[in-house]
Amino acid sequence: MNTRKTFAFVALCCCALWANAQKLTSPDGNLVMDFSLNQKGAPVYELTFKNKPVIKPSTLGLELKREDPEKRIGFEWTERKDKERVDEKMNLMTGFKVRETHTSTFDETWRPVWGEESEIRNHYNELEVTLDQPENDRYIVIRFRLFNDGLGFRYEFPQQPNLNYFVIKEEHTQFAMTGDHTAFWIPGDYDTQEYDYTTSRLSEIREKMKTAVTENSSQFVFSPTGVQTALMMKTDDGLYINLHEAALVDYACMSLNLDDKNMVFESWLTPDAKGDKGYMQTPCNSPWRTVIVSDDARNILASRITLNLNEPCKIEDTSWIHPVKYVGVWWDMITNKGTWAYTDELPSVKLGVTDYSQTKPNGKHSANTANVKRYIDFAAKHGFNAVLVEGWNQGWEDWFGKSKDYVFDFVTPYPDFDVQEIHRY
């Protein structure tokens, strides 16, 4: 290839990349998000704050679960290409082309039901990108909203013949960090968030994971570099970055898994017992993925991105909603001074069949009438608004570690808990 042809080829490539590129700026101009498609047709975004890189070029997409036809009786692949074609249909990561883009600006002030502020401003610039996947004759939408304090984006799946019902195998949303930041993190765990926070460099997460995973009654740590959101970080040049999500409805919770060689986080969804990470029916969308950023740590706490991206309140009469202080009949059980269970002599419980009146009380059941009255007296004397009572209803003997569909009876009290007397008192 001669020099002239080489130059022409490079120029054409640059033009093609430029044609796919879109830029979105926050209302105050401090944040800039760039969107493009790479050579594989994968969606890519990057984010800067006051000309400082926050998120390096990061890819977006999902991997769908393939229903294996080989498991069907009498089915055989006729050609290798048939299997490859099915695998390709599971790809919502590459092979995209930009069909159209729309930009808009939104600015409103709304009143929360309650909170730290009486009014919240919802001000952002939006980029809506419609992406066609010609190979599979389907399309998706990625919607970006850029606020003065951060970025929110989500996947949207319009209803269409070739994308109706689908199962999520993995979500491959990346957050590529610009360095080995200081992070304030807890282990990624499907079952609990009850961990102390660890402060370390991103590169130290793997090393410190063993000591960070303290004993808990129920836990499932999914990766030696997995962490939970919200994840807080600080860069060496003074930026504060928070990764989280908003509007989590009918979708799996997102944790983050770190590639600690390249300092790239990728979304990690919580699976069900089969390992599936989402059962979707179009039209539908993912939760918002959020990146809050500032050079002032106070602005991270003051950010209202999560509230602004959540759906508006649909409750018409909110007059009954107000904050309260309460005491609870549960801490003495956690400290082993009492129990949730009424008796210790039952090998198992069958709801509606087990007759607790014929069993021997263990003498340590905390949610009994006399003890709850004592808590009510304490709350009334010291200005608390309510008393939370755990362990009053039947079934707590089998509450943990049993493969059981129906553990609790939510209407029938233990023999030592008189609902009517508590109500009267």
Per-range role (PLM):
Residues 180, 283-286, 292, 309-337, ...:
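Feature activates predominantly on carbohydrate-active enzymes
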Residues 23-316:
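N-terminal accessory beta-strand-rich subdomains and adjacent acidic, glycine-rich linkers
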Residues 1-23:
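Bacterial Sec-dependent N-terminal signal peptides
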Residues 326, 338-425:
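Substrate-binding cleft of carbohydrate-active enzyme catalytic domains
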Residues 155, 296-298, 333-336, 393-396:
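Solvent-exposed loop/turn segments at secondary-structure junctions
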Residues 184, 243, 328-330, 340:
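Tryptophan-centered motif/residue detector
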Residues 121, 143, 282, 319, ...:
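Catalytic cores of large soluble enzymes that bind and process phosphate-bearing ligands
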Residues 297-316, 320-325, 369, 373-376, ...:
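Carboxylate/His-rich catalytic cores and anion/metal-binding grooves
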